Amino acid sequence: MNRPFFIALDFDEHAKRQRFLESFAAETLDVKIGMELFYREGLSVVHELKEAGYRLFLDLKLHDIPNTVGRTMRALAELDVDVVNVHAAGGKAMMEAALEGLDAGTRAGKQRPKLIAVTQLTSTDSRMLAEELLIDKAMDEVVVRYAQLAQESGLDGVVCSAHEVPLIRAACSDRFLTVTPGIRRQVDQVGDQVRVVTPGEAKALGSWAIVVGRSITAAADPLAVYREMNQDWKGATEH
């Protein structure tokens, strides 16, 4: 799976999503199905997009007791998506159960979906970490520790800010994957994400994959913006 560029399909209507994807008929896309879309359209949207040939990141961020997460992952494995995720804050036992469930649910002859863990949401800042979550460690320290726990649990990688990628790569294996949301163009508004970078900056920092949402989905010309950002992603050199 080569350096994916996932587009987050965060649409509130089926027709809007259809029109959006129709404008990309000439492109081979990687797409992300988040909670909003999955809870609205259910399994049908996964089957529809998989049959259409898209590579899928099913972004449900599971966080529950180990038994529940393990059984859920076993069911999700049958969907044959490419990437799934959990919250690292659920702990090692939960992450290990998630991996066991995926392994058990993956059909013979099929490749197990990559399993990654969310470290901290890109909407989280240091103030929230300290005042609301009562975590008295620096953001970088928390993210790296969660990444190490994910690796120790056998996961394939983590979701993190691109700014944190170099720290994670220094602390974890070279094969450990980093998927970075919070991707914008320089001209875009930041919105509710506080730790953001451009595609080229993410590549230079070592991100394996990026996730882009509103910069493309809310653009007047989504295809043109996608091509611009994808070129920035592909053309950048990893430092």
Swiss-Prot record:
Catalytic activity: orotidine 5'-phosphate + H(+) = UMP + CO2
Enzyme Commission numbers on file: 4.1.1.23
Keywords (A to Z) from UniProt: Decarboxylase, Lyase, Pyrimidine biosynthesis
Keyword Lyase: yes
InterPro entries: Aldolase_TIM, OMPdecase, OMPdecase_AS, OMPdecase_bac, OMPdeCOase_dom, RibuloseP-bd_barrel
UniProt keyword annotation of Lyase present: yes
One matching Pfam family: OMPdecase
Gene Ontology annotations of biological process type: 'de novo' pyrimidine nucleobase biosynthetic process; 'de novo' UMP biosynthetic process
Residues engaged in binding substrate: 10, 32, 59-68, 122, 184, 193, 213-214
GO cellular component term, pick one: cytosol
Pathway listed: Pyrimidine metabolism; UMP biosynthesis via de novo pathway; UMP from orotate: step 2/2
One GO MF term attached to the UniProt entry: orotidine-5'-phosphate decarboxylase activity
Active site positions, chain numbering: 61
Coiled coil: none
CDD domains according to UniProt: OMP_decarboxylase_like (cd04725)
Tree of life domain: Bacteria
Subunit structure: Homodimer.
The protein's role, per its UniProt record: Catalyzes the decarboxylation of orotidine 5'-monophosphate (OMP) to uridine 5'-monophosphate (UMP).
Family, per entry: Belongs to the OMP decarboxylase family. Type 1 subfamily.
Name used for this protein in its record: Orotidine 5'-phosphate decarboxylase
Organism the protein comes from: Shouchella clausii (strain KSM-K16) (Alkalihalobacillus clausii)
